[in-house]
Amino acid sequence: RDQLPYEIDGVVVKVNRRDWQSRLGMKSRSPRWAIAYKFAPRKEITTVQDIVVSVGRTGTLTPVALLKPVEVGGVTISRATLHNADEVARKDIRIGDTVKVERAGDVIPAIAERIPVLGEQRHTPFCMPDHCPVCGSSVGRDGAYFYCTGQSFCGAQLKGAIEHFASKHALN
């Protein structure tokens, strides 16, 4: 992979003979006559500088790690989603932690793991806010997910709804 003059994330091996392809058939999502082998994602070490909460168009609050910028597979990574509060707790990610970062599927920045450092002084564990960081409305919880109750009064939700409405997938 590293010796190639271009970026690839894996290799697809397939049967070329159409009569064999026809005999092998299809699975629900892919042909039985082809298989993809993905390389393990590249990983680099960096530091969590902060954890902020973003508000999506549906009001879902998502913790995001702000990272010391690091290059992973030709792309500079400075942010990575932490998905939800349960995932942050499971991985025990805190501000100041040394972490291993990867691009999941060679695309999406993700924290693969925390790297313990001998004698480190760790920050307090991350907690989701009680109020929306954008509009100040109270925050509700549904299983692992936290959400803003502000609906159309929340600037982030309103902006996201307008962007979604005007997108190719919605307005079309």
Task: List each language-model region with its residue ranges.
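RNA/tRNA-interacting regions in translation and RNA-turnover enzymes
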Residues: 1-172
